[in-house]
Amino acid sequence: SAPYYDDAATKEYNRLNDTNDSVFVMRYFAETANTGNYGNSVAGNLNMDPSGQTVDAQLFFDPGWNQYMYSNTSGRDLHYDAGAMLVPSNAALDYWWNHDGKVLQNMYGSWDNVPIKVLVKMMNINMINTFSETVPSKFNNIVDNTTKVPLGVTTSDVDSCFMGCNGVIYLTNKVFTPADYSSVSFPALVNQNTMSVIYWAIENLNFEPYLNSMDSYYSFITPTNNAMLSYVDPCSYAASKTVLYTFFYDDKAKTVKAHRYYYDLDSGSIDTSTSLSDATGDQVKDRLEDLLNGLIIVGNVEDGHSYYKSKGGSPIHVTNAGVVGSMTVAGGLQLERSKHVIINKIYDQSENGNGKAYVVDDNIPLTSKRSTYNILQKDERYSEFFKLLDGSRGSLISQKLSGTYSCVDYNISLFDAYNYTVYVPTNESIMKLITDGYLPTWDDYEKLTVDDFGGDRKAYNNGRNTLADIITNFLRYHIQDNSVFIGGNIMNNVKFETSKINPLNKRFFSLTVNADDNSLSVEDQLGNMRNVTKQSGLYNNIGREYWFQVSGSGTSAVDQIYNASDVVVNQIDGPLFYEQNQLRPWRAVIGLSTNGAKLSKAGRK
């Protein structure tokens, strides 16, 4: 709280008392407070002190103001309701401080040393903005203000009740604490000196309710402020020079900002000779939101596997799980460069909370810079599948989304801000399909002429369209929703949808996947069982496809991540089929002679 000068009150006081003095009003920093003057109350957000500096923390509402109720409801005022507060007795607070609150006592020593940013979490959970809905018979309506889960208040928890002019005080014999104190985000909250950047993102980008949920178990990779100096901007992947963001917390403005520099990924050197503008506020939020989605893993990374999917769908590779100093994590970017990030400390919040926080100090696990197109193009062992995909520009792959958003090279247009698996049959198996006359190539498509159809242009156009459909449908059936890995979650006959729609029921054809720590197999609609080729560079190839929104140009260009899709590419030992009709010669399908085409039982090899 702080005293604020009130000009209207000063004038009225001096008029009534024929004097020349100044009147100040004590106000609490609060999300709902009086930001007006004497005689003209205005409900607003009071987040600045009298000198204009942004404050560290705010109460839920101003308990010293009589009109905080119904500030936005026409025709209602404080006479219709009041607020309430759960206030623990001194004895209850002392007991909590020496038992469940011991972690704060050990960290800060005394109540006076606990930062207001930490204390306000407890204060706000005990501030209730409606008394009428939380009378003793309705105590189950009192919930955590972030998770909306009931606090479990009972009448036996209340020793006394005191009525004030603007609300009610329930004196309690126990302390009700927020989910923040049990959450995997708690280490970031209480270590503001070293983790203020990531906690600002948690608090301001709406991750607090998610991480406070006690219904899930989280493994939260928590970067220190030092680690946040090494964020490689994915929006620069399409540019000639990579850009590095160095995030920092501006204590005066109480917000996170970022300097930007050109950066050499290979050498790790920062180019300070070229002046780049600092990131805008929107860019900071955009990058931090994407980063946080990649740092939160729903589940226990110490359960014995190697690959885990983050909240956003990006994979994280884990080694030596649970061992501080030797445990490592790696995102797609690290895996592409054969690097990893060491876990420096582990905070265990699992006993009374919702998981563990894994602290990284030297770097951050970052997402891949490779698209599916890039992964396939760079490895000759994927060449036949790549030729088919490359020929489908404009239908399955694109450089533009909605004519507005750009990408690194080519993105698969079927992807939609989710995670996927692309199964790539071996070159030999695809070539056999082509040689046997079952699968056309784009060369076959281009070589079709009207004369092949006796001059019938309609038949010619239909033939070309059918040929394109045969190729693209073959590709579509090899693209599956959900990324699956060797070394990821164990799967037993789990069905996943592909990108190929069954025209009969308008549902997507499925694949059946079996996977463990050593192998992965996939079964198609015809019962063919294909195995992932477990050779270096042919499985668990991680990629990410971004759509960027760019305005401006040069060093002052403002770019945003519009959306991103994660992908893993796995080679399989044979093609996948969704229907028997795919094993008809394509020339016969479009009404041409099959003379010269070698035909065989390709589907059962």
List each model region and its residues.
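Mature, structured domains of secreted/extracytosolic soluble proteins
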Residues: 1-605
